[in-house]
Every structure is written in C-alpha cells, then in structure tokens.
Regions:
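Basic, Lys/Arg- and aromatic-enriched nucleic-acid-binding interface segment
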Residues: 85, 89-93, 102-110, 114-177, ...
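N-terminal DNA-binding module of tyrosine recombinases/phage integrases
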Residues: 1-68, 232-261
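Conserved tyrosine-mediated DNA breakage-rejoining catalytic core shared by Y-recombinases
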Residues: 118, 123, 177-254
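Short, basic (Lys/Arg/His-rich) helix/loop patches that form interaction surfaces
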Residues: 150, 154-155, 167, 216, ...
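Short functional hotspots where side chains directly engage DNA or cofactors
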Residues: 188-191, 295, 306, 315-336, ...
Length: 351
C-alpha cells in the first residue's frame, strides 16, 4: 500500500520542462546548493570538476547520461588510468551529487533518478576492487611505536605526536587545539575546531563533521605530560615574553576573531607557530633512518586498533574518535593486527 502511495505521489511531481547540461547543474549547485559545505569539501569538488569531469561531461545533458556510461568511466579511471580506489570513490560521490541536484530541481524525472541512484540492480556503483589493492587499516606495531616514542621524545613535534598516539586526533585537530580547551583538572580535551590553510592563510575553522566535536579523556601518562607542558608554558610567558610577542603569529579563530599563536598547544617556547607542515620533516627522517612509513594519520589508526584490541565498547570508541557512523569504528574491531593475530593463535591453541 505504501509503495502505491509513493508511486502516486511521484506521478504528481512536475515533469522536467527544461533540459540542463551537467555544467549548468554544477554551476547552479555552486551558487545555491553548497553554502553550508566546508571549505575543503568545496575545494575537492571544484578540483574534480575542473580537472576531470568538466571536459568529459560538462556539455552533455544530464538526462541523457546512463548508469552504464558512468560505471564505464569509473572503471576507466580505476583500471586503465591507475587512480586509487579511494580517489575514484570521490568521482562516484560527485555523480550522486549531480544527479541528486538535478532531480531536486526537476531536471531529471523520477524514473531516471531511481534507475541512476536508487535501484540496487541498476544504480551507479564502483568497479570491482582489484585483488592486490589494500584498503586495510594501517597501524604501527608495538616495536614500531617504541622506535617512534624514542624518536619524538624531546623534539618540537613531541606534543603533536602524543596527541595522535594517545588521543587519536586528526592532524588538523591536533594543530588547532587551544590551551583553553585543555582541562588538566578533569583530564579532558575538548575538540571543537581544526587548523586549515585557506587561500594561503592559517585559520581555525569548523571540524570535519558534526560528530567530530567531542570531549576526549586523557590517559594518566598524557595528563602528566600536559601538566609539565603547562608549567613550562608559564615559565616561558615570564622569561620569554618579548621574544614570544615578537615571534607570535596572529591567526583567525573559529568565530572570526584574531588570536595569537601562543594560545595554541602546539606553539614553540619562543612563540613561533607550528602547523600541519611541521610533520613533514619527521616523516622523511623516520623513513630514512628506520624504514618506517610514517603518516600522522596512522597514529589515529593505531589508537583505534589498540583500543579495539583492549575490548573498548564500540560506542565509546566511536565517540572518542569522532566518527559519524559506527560502521567506521567497527573496522578497527575486524582489522587483523599483529597483536590480534597473536590473540587468535593463543585462543586456537586452547581448542
């Protein structure tokens, strides 16, 4: 009965009266449909459009594009051009976006939209994953962590490293952390903004998603470290006041106000700001010295993997990591880490 009602309602929807090219649909979306989107989202969409989609599909009418044509194009990108699976997924999202915009503005009829985006047998989809492609979570082993702990100890990047190691922060969240969001008494850290470069300017902006805003619990080791860091900061404010004032950088905060770089947790004693680029040199040196492929985001993977191995309830880990979907968190529970394999073998030997 509900299906009949839905069909009746859809049949009353006005038929498309104006044909639009994909370029016209995208331009209309840019003007009217994405005012609430994040800066990085807009940049990524514009990059895919200008560098790939515009030349191939821009002049085509959106109502003449078939699902097979889209799937063939995605297959070409992934299999023939060798683009990564994750990158090609961005193209799939763009097509869903364009078809959705066209449907909502009556440039696509309901049957065409359902065929392209709803019906599981006909809708556009990613090509089959290659057998040699790895989408597994990359996490550091205990042995690698011991090397990294020793490498970062006492360096300018130690604070950022520990925030990734023991809190699982994203790199932009880490460098956007303000001292006012660190509660040493209760041992918590409030994550409510991130650092970004926008038009070559450093800004503190909104988080990646709504769920990314969260309060993180600090472990005892990190709490002790931050207590010492706060004490050293007080001493620096007294003894290096002139130098800090000279080297400070004024940046734009979340609310548009101007703040000093000295308000950030990742600020050098002399007042100089640290940014996401501060991890570039350690990344190169770790690879050269130890042969470890270090990416800051792998610390987040490691945090999630280790917390899952310790049987942390999924809803708690989801909250701590700021995931918008618990299915993302569940990946850490099914990933096979070295420690997980050891536990599995130990249990197998008990059979």
């Amino acid at each position: 009965r509900q299906a009949a009602i839905d069909r009746e309602q859809n049949s009353r929807k006005p038929k498309p009266t104006v044909r639009k090219t994909i370029q016209e649909v995208y331009q209309e979306y840019c003007v009217n449909g994405r005012n609430d989107r994040a800066y990085t989202t807009k940049r990524k969409q514009d990059s895919l459009w200008k560098n790939h989609l515009c030349a191939r599909f821009g002049e085509r009418y959106i109502d003449e594009i078939s699902a097979a044509e889209v799937v063939d194009y995605l297959t070409e990108l992934y299999c023939s051009r060798g683009l990564s699976y994750r990158y090609v997924e961005g193209f799939l999202k763009m097509f869903y976006l364009l078809f959705g915009q066209a449907y909502s503005r009556n440039y696509l009829d309901v049957d065409s939209y359902n065929k392209l985006c709803v019906n599981k047998d006909t809708k556009i989809h990613m090509p089959k994953l290659k057998t040699d492609d790895e989408l597994d979570i990359v996490a550091f082993s205990r042995e690698e962590l011991a090397i990294l702990d020793d490498y970062f100890h006492g360096t300018n990047a130690e604070t950022a490293y520990l925030l990734g190691r023991y809190c699982g922060l994203r790199i932009n969240e880490c460098y956007g952390l303000k001292w006012s969001n660190v509660d040493l008494k209760n041992g918590t850290i409030l994550i409510d903004r991130q650092m970004q470069y926008q038009e070559s300017r450093i800004k503190l902006v909104s988080l990646k998603t709504r769920n990314a805003k969260r309060t993180i619990q600090m472990c005892d080791k990190l709490k002790v470290y931050f207590q010492g860091l706060a004490e050293r900061r007080e001493q620096d404010q007294l003894h290096l006041a002139d130098l800090r004032e000279q080297n400070q950088r004024i940046i734009e905060d979340l609310d548009g106000s101007k703040i000093s770089s000295t308000e950030l947790v990742n600020c050098l004693p002399d007042g100089k700001i640290q940014t996401v680029n501060s991890m570039k040199y350690p990344t190169q040196e770790i690879k050269a010295k130890y042969g470890i492929m270090f990416k800051y985001h792998y610390l987040r993977h490691t945090y999630g993997t280790m917390m899952a191995e310790l049987n942390t309830p999924q809803h708690l880990l989801c909250s701590q990591m700021g995931h918008g979907n618990i299915q993302v968190t569940q990946r850490y529970y099914i990933a096979l880490s070295r420690a997980g394999i050891d536990i599995l073998r130990e249990n197998l030997n008990r059979l």
